[in-house]
Every structure is written in C-alpha cells, then in structure tokens.
Amino acid sequence: MAAGLARLLLLLGLSAGGPAPAGAAKMKVVEEPNAFGVNNPFLPQASRLQAKRDPSPVSGPVHLFRLSGKCFSLVESTYKYEFCPFHNVTQHEQTFRWNAYSGILGIWHEWEIANNTFTGMWMRDGDACRSRSRQSKVELACGKSNRLAHVSEPSTCVYALTFETPLVCHPHALLVYPTLPEALQRQWDQVEQDLADELITPQGHEKLLRTLFEDAGYLKTPEENEPTQLEGGPDSLGFETLENCRKAHKELSKEIKRLKGLLTQHGIPYTRPTETSNLEHLGHETPRAKSPEQLRGDPGLRGSL
C-alpha cells in the first residue's frame, strides 16, 4: 500500500513540473542568407543547377591537378561566387527573396596560352544570358594560400576571376613546353627549327603550335569551340560566329522556299516587301477597288469589311 502511494505521488510530481521552458531549447544560427533553389532538399532535382555539358578533362601542369575536386568561394556585394578548378564557376545571390538567383557562369573548357605560358583558364557554356552563354576567364596568380581573390564582369555575360595559389609562384610553374609528352616536344622543336630556317612564316608557326596544343588537349579545335545549343532551338544560339550566321541564313532560305510553295499550292499571290510603294511606307495607301473577299498573309480568308 505504501509503495503504491509513493508511486502515485511521484507521478503527480512529474506532471506538476510541466514541459521544459522554451528558453532551454537550442537555437541554430544561420550563417548565410537564403539559398532557396540551390540547397533546398525539398525541391525537385530539376530546380537545381544543371550544366549543359560535362567539363573538359583535367589538363595542363600536373602540379595543378590537386586542385581538381575542390571549390573556393568569395562573397562580393550580394553575390557568392564559387570556383571549382577544372569543373565550373557558379554565382549565388545572397538574399532573403524566395527566388534568389543562382546560375553557372561557365564550365571548364580550355586553357589560354600565350608566349609558351598558360595565361588563364576558360570556363564556357554557362547559363543563358540574352542570346549568348555566360563565360568566365580565370587568371592564376601567386599567393600564400589557395583562394578566390577577385571577381568582376568587364563586359556583359563575361566574367573575370583571379585565383591565388602558391602552386604558380615558381617562374616556370605555368610553362607549356615541360608539360608536353616527348613526342610533342620533338614536334615543337622541329617547328622552331623550321621557323629559324625560314621554311615557314610566323603565321604558319603560330598555326602549327596551335595544332600541337590541340593535340595535347590544352586547346579545343574550332569545331569543339562551337557554342553549345541553348534550350529553345537554333534561334536561341544568336549570331556569335560567322558559321552560325551561315547556318541561320541557310535555314531561313529553306523556310522561305517552303512557305512560298505553300502559298503557290493554295493559289495565294504574294509580293516582296521591297515592291511596296513609298506612299504605303508613309502610311498613305493607294486607292484600290474593294473586292468581296480580301486575302491575308495566311491561307485563311477574311470577309469584306
């Protein structure tokens, strides 16, 4: 009896204590503003950043390969930039808006080479920006630690990044020749000898070296440099190159021919825009006799007004 009474008193004491005070609960500190749309696990996978293609293979100086698989970030103004060597460059808007912008500023594409030196990393085929794709050039500079030091946008949709690393502090760290396999080094030696013997012109020398760098995988061929087609068809490519203009002209010519055939098939006359009189251009139409039915620019008919 006494034991049962003791248990009853114990239960009553616990219920009287009530729940723990709200102040005792732990609070999680959010270090960065909203990243909705990027790291939200409840969103479908399609809402996350999606690249148009895979990055190019890792290439260049072997001592830089250790940077592959790592990412370095920098917050400037209201944007967070992230550079992942040999992978991509991304931008994330730091805001509390539900639709904060996040996008890809470029995917690892090729090196830039000048005077036997790797002068920069090109990240191309980023997210759409008007009629073109965003792209970034990353300059490697000597520094005490690996860090993304600076980001700017010198022209619309083109970004310039400076990445500091102790891996490029040696004066020969970015030379191209030592990174080449023996066979390509011998080819380069022959090209230099031919130039010295005046067997090739400076222009020919430059062209041969470019081909050599393409064989090494440091530069892309002209065909590989064709812009990746944006979602929405060929019209969304824009006219970034002469080849694109030629392709677009050819497609438009075929479409015009097809439409003319349809008009002829349905017995609908058509005239060229250049045949319109000056008075019509000025808004004064030449008087015409009314007809019961007036043809429009499509196969349909419109009744008299």
Swiss-Prot record:
Q: Which SMART domains match?
A: DMAP_binding
Q: Where is the protein localized?
A: Secreted; Golgi apparatus
Signal sequence annotation: 1-24
Segments forming domain DMAP1-binding: 176-279
What Gene Ontology cellular component terms go with this record? extracellular exosome; Golgi apparatus; UDP-N-acetylglucosamine-lysosomal-enzyme N-acetylglucosaminephosphotransferase complex
What does the record say mutating residue 106 to S does? In MLIIIC; decreased localization to Golgi apparatus
Name the keywords, alphabetized.
Disease variant, Disulfide bond, Glycoprotein, Golgi apparatus, Mucolipidosis, Secreted, Signal
Pfam families, A to Z: PRKCSH (PF07915)
The SS bond pairs are: 71-84, 129-157, 142-169
Query: Gene3D superfamilies of this UniProt entry?
Result: Mannose-6-phosphate receptor binding domain (2.70.130.10)
Give the result of residue 230 to V, as annotated: Rare variant; found in individuals suffering from stuttering; uncertain significance
Predominant cellular place of this UniProt entry's protein: secreted
Q: Name one GO biological process term.
A: N-glycan processing to lysosome
- Specify the domain of life of the species encoding this protein: Eukaryota
Q: Where is the MRH domain?
A: 69-171
Region ranges (Disordered): 267-305
The organs and tissues expressing this protein are described as: Widely expressed.
PTM (free text)? Cys-245 mediates the formation of the interchain disulfide bond for formation of the homodimer. Cys-142, Cys-157 and Cys-169 are involved in intramolecular disulfide bonds formation.
Gene Ontology molecular function terms on file: protein homodimerization activity
What does the subunit section of this Swiss-Prot or TrEMBL entry state?
A: Homodimer; disulfide-linked. Hexamer of two alpha (GNPTAB), two beta (GNPTAB) and two gamma (GNPTG) subunits; disulfide-linked. The alpha and/or the beta subunits of the enzyme constitute the catalytic subunits.
As for what it does, the entry says: Non-catalytic subunit of the N-acetylglucosamine-1-phosphotransferase complex, an enzyme that catalyzes the formation of mannose 6-phosphate (M6P) markers on high mannose type oligosaccharides in the Golgi apparatus. Binds and presents the high mannose glycans of the acceptor to the catalytic alpha and beta subunits (GNPTAB). Enhances the rate of N-acetylglucosamine-1-phosphate transfer to the oligosaccharides of acid hydrolase acceptors.
Q: What is this protein identified as?
A: N-acetylglucosamine-1-phosphotransferase subunit gamma
Q: Which organism is it from?
A: Homo sapiens
Lineage start? Eukaryota, Metazoa, Chordata, Craniata, Vertebrata
